Amino acid sequence: MCDNMKRLFFAIYINFLLLNSVSAQHKFTYRTEKLTTCDSIFLVDLSLDNEANKFVFDNVRDALKMAEKVRANGLKRKIRIFFSPNVYWVDDKDDNKIVMPEKPNSGVASGIEIKAGNINMIGLTGNPEDVVIAGNRGEKYGADRMYTMFDWVGDDLTMEDLTFGNFCSIDLVYKRNPDLDHEKRTDRVTGAKIAIVRGDRIHLKNCIFKGGKNTSPFNTINGGRHFLENCTIICGENSLPANAVFLNCKFTFNTNKPLYSPMQTGVVFLNCDFSTNEYKPFVMRKGGPATMIDCRWEVSHLRNELIYWTQTGQIDMRAYLSNNTVNGDSMKLWVGPWIPVDITNKPLLRAYKLADGTYNIFNLMRGEDDWNLTKQNTEGLKKIPTLLSVTQRRIQLENEVDEVNIGAKAYMFSDLNNPVPAKLTWDFEKPSYKEYLRITQDDQGRCTVKGIKENENEKNVTFIKVTSANGLESSSRINIYPRQLPPPEFTKTPELKRVKDELVLNYKLDLQNGLRDESVIKWYRCVKDKDGNPVKDKWYLTATTNVVGEPHNRYKLTRADEGYIIKASIATKHQRCEANPQVWSYTSDVIRNAPKQISYDVNMKYLPTQVQPDIVDGVWTMTVNKPADTKKYKWSVERQDSLVWLYDMGFDGAANSYGLTLAHRGARMMFTPESHIVYKAMSIQFDVDPCKEIGQGFAGNDGQYMDLYIMYNNRTNSGYALRIFRDKDYDHAVKMVFLKYTNGEYKKVCEPVAVTGFRRGCHISLEMKGKKLTASLTNKVQVPYDTLGIPAEASLTAVVEPSTFGGFGLQHTGSIGGSGIVIKGLKLDWK
């Protein structure tokens, strides 16, 4: 049956019900309003029978699905759904089945999916505690993925006088009738949302939202306007909406990062109260536009009397503040990567708060359609922008050569489509930057910048600031690179020489006037033909230069190099030029009499990081691999280049820590020593800084882990491994377990143990000797928060079948970026 015919029959059915059952419709009172149920007035009451023909329901799902049908039938007016006092579950609270996403590629499983707008859900008594709309599922606890009670598509949604709670990891306490109390599904904090919305004009009024991690009180994921007034929010990390205005709201945070990152024009907190026990409270994890006016923080374990605005900021954003307190005193804000702007005495304050003390909600919510949800008197109110955005956050220019034009635009809150006029002024963030940069401003509010320091050899980083007449600010980072010169020439041509057990590339460059050697040197080993003779038609990269300014001109030989020709390439460079074309140097003969490799202290600065799939003795194998046990989890392609690893700085918990980091999810490295040797013992010393801060290691428990292979046959994927993994039991710890691999299939050879030390400062020791396999994870970095009885250090011991292979490997299946790792050190020893 076509959709039009379905709608026709449904319309006939609805009209029949309305014409023949008016006298049977249910009558009730809301405040002083006497109401009768109809196609735009629903009543949900557990004490009544579920009678769709009367628009009376005993559950949330049927009411919303009827609203969806009525709306699809063409009804234009608002649908009001009233709830009598009770606890309403979106699905069976005691059902142990695992909810799967309805769409195969969706990352979210849902309780109720609905496509309908212009709906108002209302608690009948006016007390939000009387009506509880509840869910009881979270990621890995009743749901296969991240779970949301509502997955809603629709504009103009209003929720009023209701409590919404995902009680997967918190207890439901219903004061009106304790018989309806319900114990949480798990003690573990897990990803459990209340609602995600693809829509605009979302209004939450006098509601309570309760949850753990990822609470999501009707968060709009498409940038739609979102207004919460007189609401109470109790939540964990990454919970708050990213584009919203909060008025007179109360927050209790069970995390130090309740908001992941603001989007669009950001978030605004007006006259709100915040409470947390976290020792180092952040407003958000990653920076974006945000404003806080007339707010109060109560923090029981405050460190240094500071509120930390964000862990990772954006160059051009600002924190706009006025009249905020922490524990009764004026708010002290950690500047960090953001610059706070006190707007108390600036015209910008009027964008948020009028002279009479009322809050300018219309200015914030009006958008392109002048949405005036609070019925504010708009006479005489002008548009006051709240966001100033530069056209370029980061600029690179060549000193004394390049001129770059920069502009900025001002925007109203919740409207990025229509920039508004603003008078702009450009200046230096610091007076000292004038030594390196010249700013020229035109009469259109744009500026031109040029590097001006003569004969400068070094890169200089400067910041310029743009300010609007009403007090908005933004900035650009300008990296001024020295004026380019020709690359250096050789004064001594490259020559490969063997010095004991090393090859040394000797050369000299013509470097004057403070220039330094930043040449890129790479080392290669040839292949052999089927008869074992060296040939020069294919080369394996065995070492490289990963760090600018540290040319790797020495190559340590091992017995795996015997019988091969080694070559080195050098691309000469200093800090004021691009690299020259490569010049090659070769050993005059094959390598002979190299030492047996019994110890290998791996220097991450020189480790090859590009894809190299072949398994060859003495050569690193670098691949992106999706293990079979992650098959059911969809991975997105995160990079489109040949790198598997990067030598770079970490994120979040590994900020300012340099080492080898993931370039791809599924990054794997393997090293195969001399394969003809029978190995009796092997040990691994591994130093790592995970980016996750509190010991959880990975972004989720969807097949994310790290395996360290020991005494491994890389050719057959057989041997042993220590697995570090996150599972559903903990949000602040990982588990570690031994695995035995046989042709890529594995089984556990011990019981897992939990540990919280898989965070910055982690050291892992792994050893196999005969039948004894041991591992320890230690961390001497003390943390000020409660680890809930889980130790920071742990060890494992198992008796296993011996292995005679000496291969090493590392497989990481976690996300890149903030869920990755920084490998600081790796040492391998064999007997």
What spans do the regions from the language model cover?
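Ser/Thr/Pro/Gly-rich low-complexity disordered regions
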Residues: 383-425, 430-601
